[in-house]
From Swiss-Prot:
Keyword Transmembrane in record: yes
Pfam family, one: Mito_carr
Its membrane topology: Multi-pass membrane protein
Highest taxon of the lineage: Eukaryota
Record-linked Gene3D superfamilies: Mitochondrial carrier domain
Protein's gene: slc25a38
Keywords, comma-separated and alphabetical: Membrane, Mitochondrion, Mitochondrion inner membrane, Repeat, Transmembrane, Transmembrane helix, Transport
Entry keyword annotation includes Transport: yes
The Solcar repeat ranges on this chain: 22-112, 119-203, 213-297
UniProt family annotation: Belongs to the mitochondrial carrier (TC 2.A.29) family. SLC25A38 subfamily.
PANTHER family tied to this protein: MITOCHONDRIAL GLYCINE TRANSPORTER (PTHR46181:SF3)
Top-level taxonomy: Eukaryota, Metazoa, Chordata, Craniata, Vertebrata
Catalysed transformations (reactions): glycine(in) = glycine(out)
Residues annotated as transmembrane: 28-53, 87-113, 125-150, 178-201, 217-243, 272-290
Protein name in UniProt: Mitochondrial glycine transporter
Amino acid sequence: MSDALVMAGEPLMSGNCFSQMHPVFKAFVCGSLSGTCSTLLFQPLDLVKTRLQAHQLSASAAGSRPRMLNLFIKVIRNENILGLWRGVSPSFLRCIPGVGLYFSTLYTLKHHFFSERDPKPLESVMLGAGSRTVAAVCMLPFTVVKTRYESGKYGYKSVYGALKNIYKTEGPRGLFSGLTATLMRDAPFSGIYLMFYTRAKKLVPQDQIDPLFSPVLNFGCGIVAGILASVATQPADVIKTHIQLSHEKCHWTGQVALNIYQNHGLTGFFRGGLPRALRRTLMAAMAWTVYEQMMEKMGLKS
């Protein structure tokens, strides 16, 4: 199929360097490009989510609770429209290689263990969770910096300066703060998402649909999968944000969860849930749609 695409004059495959790439590296490139698009578009939602959760962490959170729309307006008013993209640099440093690493790891695992058949639902969960674990651990220092940038509580001048400051004041442990909560959030999200996404796609008669509408249908399947996965992993996201915004050097995930419950009840675990669900759902749906379309252009099965 790859040769046929080259002969057909597909621009994506016209260069010899691209056609000679290892399939795993092609998956990395496709994933990185899809991550770039989705991160840039939906960064404002991530910033608002972090601000909502940071407000809950402060002592004044027991009083008035800002709503998502009010926070959007406040950020634009105080920091101008570009303030909504505060923290986009560490987001890029985390998501571009992170999404590429996720998709290339997923591609490797799928083609190693499931080259002859499609994975079953539970196997899809394990594939997604395992791939995300690799990416999340590698990118966690940038996740910590991104969270602190977006909160507006830290005066870091650059990503490098932030990494240096955290390492100097908190040690290597500070760069990996919230690791447990991050894995509790990201691994299940990716596993649940992949399971529902592949199941939803199987319900759609792909052979009876015009290929022109295939990306739209895949995006719709991604929306459904993203909503379900976001709701299931929202508590872990709140815990992760509380840990990474805290000045304390030692954190225990269980203690943070207990504090949230004691101070805010069960609803505290779903603070910032709407902007996160919107962002994660739209980002995942777009990333998968772009990734699969690019892989198809390269003649590879995603």
